[in-house]
């Protein structure tokens, strides 16, 4: 019986996670974590939305990340777009200065976090965020938001929404590392951010955003599980 | 105390220490009653501990999902005996390199659902009342076994029909059924999409044709190494009635389509009455009329045949070499096909299969049809893929299936990189002798009209020798009639033999809701003999969750969930891959694994049979003495892996003979640790085992190759047809030799099956044939009279669920899809499976959810149609079919469905079992598609025609709706143990 | 405190003696931190005369003095009968266990400076646990953690004994490597907090047993750091 550790088939299997960017390979001395969402690859499966709840204990009524569905056009020239949304980990976040106890701050590595010990649950930051990325968790009495699954990052693993993404639409990595998946996407594709006019300098990029949010003729139908119902705009 | 100042050296030299306890052992200065806390352990153990710590005290295990038919490879994290995380397995390629969809993740909410069946239940009161009491396993097994033996005595063992429903790891139940003496074991395949698979079965003895977009695949390099081939080759994919982005059954088509488009500029066309999620990425959406796929394919074929020109590079559609060498019966097929070309179609007044004819039938502009035909002909490699909903659910789906295969074959796209692969004939085999099919070869005797007849047990089959001689995938849609009328065998040696369906074991299935019109099944399950006893004398329901069918069962047995049992994943890749479903946690409550249930029942049946008959068909050595654990069972199932021939290029194992069937681990085959049988042409390596799979991250694979329909013939120094093609002639058969067996059976008996007669057939035609679908006034003149009153075609489509057993999962109630599953719920209270901060585990809590926060099944309707009726999104409407059956739904008004079509999500509405948790609460204003389906079965295979129906529409109120729905929607069922945590 | 004298080259036997000496002391430190002292144990301390020898001839005055005080305290307890023993146990509990926060909890995590780490199972605990794992050691206990002073001392003890075994097998490299690791452990862990802990015990304890023990521990740790430095310089 050959030593299975030498099996070429096991070796092939061990190459796979690298091929699919499941792990954070190299860490530069000063990583800057950034996410790119490629809307041309999103298949609207909601895996990110559900995986995040599983990973971070987000209650049913709330979301750290969610996916909106936008339908536009007139039969048969119609379009449907899926728009995954999350905290944009802004460089100039409007949520940070409003905190009365200094419980929220932007880390060196770019992640905007909440210190749950300090947070008193006043909810000012929830209102201050133009993206509605935060929520008040009644279970914990604090606010909660995306933290790029920090607990996984420290183990060299990508956030749950990234590893479970069916279409490979969520790309995550260190923008200071030119070999990282995000750096490669950012240098080869046109990207845009949501609501740049807020001045928050959001650091979640989208490929194909213009196409998705283009105002065309006819109304748009928007379904947002965070809000419920069907919205016509 | 003196103050001697000495040096350290001096101190040591004084031998002070030497005089003390010098034993170099761990007992220095230790009081007798204490031992060391620190323990030295070997490096492997340290490695394992470090890995566990790295994941926070969590065990990482590999298993396979069951939340939909894709059965993806999972990596699950288990802590303190509970599953806390579900991810995709990144060490296998099957699901997008380790992705896991929302359904997979929501599996946590099925596993820890408050609505799981906790213990065995026995019915008290009438079937359908939903009144059960708790009983012990011993009592349940005892009573069921006793009853089964009773039934065997009265009618013969063939009176037992075992239906293992929607979940594929069912071999234990089939084995038990066959050993008991009944050949009647069926599963979901019978009601899935048999017409869709028909062409592949006839032509290549296969089943599912999928585009070659599974990447990466392992291929053999010229230097002998194996490397990942990660490049996409497809240039054009046409999805007809197939929606990989939502109906994730062949999961790798999901990311495969995305990547082929992004990395290889592959064009994607979606042909579907509804704008499916797959269409969001497509280069063009062709909103075809429902039920006209065959018409489209016929027109494409005619166009290709009429315009093909080998001299013109822009018209080189047909690959003549493939046809000449590897296809049987092409000229006859062509002749039969062409024989329609001059006929005038009474419905449209146009010649069959012309572009104008197709335009009139499909509702697509002729330029579009021409575009499809031309591009499919000229762009290579290309793949034409047709689906389950359509044509699989249409009466005439066979026609489309056969034409689809022909189109792929003659354009030279079959088995080429980026083309079309028949995944059934290249996937790894599994099951083998564990399934017990060998028991069906037993010789049995029956007395028929006073004459004793002896033949094999399988000749008693209720369908193959009953009314459906050609239904090789069995028939479940006809169960209601069969229960009411009983079985009379008409074919084979046992013809004339009669028996009832007296016992029905339904495992992980929900035929009441998924196999046809609900009321028909209820009627059959409730039917009584004159003496007041049920015609169906025994109904056993086995599952983890309590679905509608359970309401009519006599016994309900809790089966271990997919995370609690071991089996093999049933997958359809483009090359052999196999992975394990591992029991990662212990069964909750009193749930038992299938192997245990099989053994318990087998033993009790054995005991009763010995008492009753003095002998038993159950051999202890074939059950509990052989399978002490489920691992024993799965190891036997793995003996036949991969069971595929060493063919194609690059040749998977150049060191093994080409064309020989391979068994065993890829390592043993690779390294020559094999035994070769030159007579049987088999290479046997070391068998794959459960332990082996666990060491390989849960699964393993054998190399991919293409052109597997041919083998190199060394003698003739040329290619010959064969390889994976195991048809009679070893060629791609457009002369349908497969039908010959059935025609012979029918001829011998002199009885033509009713469903063939309706088509005007005395036997199955061995080449191209054409007939129309039903309930379709665009194609079948018989239905013209309904056009005005019932202006809508009703079709069913998919949302982020699968089968009918996941709709209690709360996270899936937040996944709006395609206008069919929309957050328009009323406010309600429920018990739910909820996560806690930090995601530490799933607990059960009671919550009140406000309006519009839970997705419900809706009826999707085009805006233009809605405006005619004054319907707006959220309005309650009633759908009524010509049979007077009704369903109620909230409307979703949009632009993303063809006018004249109404679309409903499968199993999204009218769910009247409390086991459906939150979805149960909305049953009164959500549509159950099965209420509107006709009891109409397609010929040949007896598939229910789920997609053939027409309806009329009007607005209604909730009061009216409540009164017009059948009673079982209004009852508030409370099932013992279900939802009572 | 340390003398300016360097340790010259020793013979193999002498190294072994030195190692066993160190192991013996670590064993005492380990026992006193991990368990309430039994009468039997205290008697052993007296009778095996190990401490007496130290008092008589060890070059370092602080060590001699604190050992002397410690032995005195031991004798006092033995003379004091049952009550004295029980008082000692009560003191052990008050210092190291509870109820409520113990006066001087013997866990490295709680004595390290960074304010986030000041909790049980903090950064320091993580490091010690990983250190032990790298040495192939796991802690089998439901009630104490790896960064307990007694466990850290147990580690020093068992690794010293291992070093003896290496020498006896003539595995010089193995022997040196262990000493290198021990020096690192001392510097990165023991030195950083044991002194603080011992100062606190000295300050807060009412019992001369624990006060003198704390002093002895403190001085020995410093001494051992020195010893190791000098041994390694020669090798």
Regions found by a protein language model. Give the residues of each.
Chain B
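Phosphate/diphosphate-binding loops
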Residues: 537-538, 583-602
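A glycine-rich phosphate-binding loop feature that marks nucleotide/adenosyl-phosphate handling sites
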Residues: 165-166, 376, 420-431, 615-635
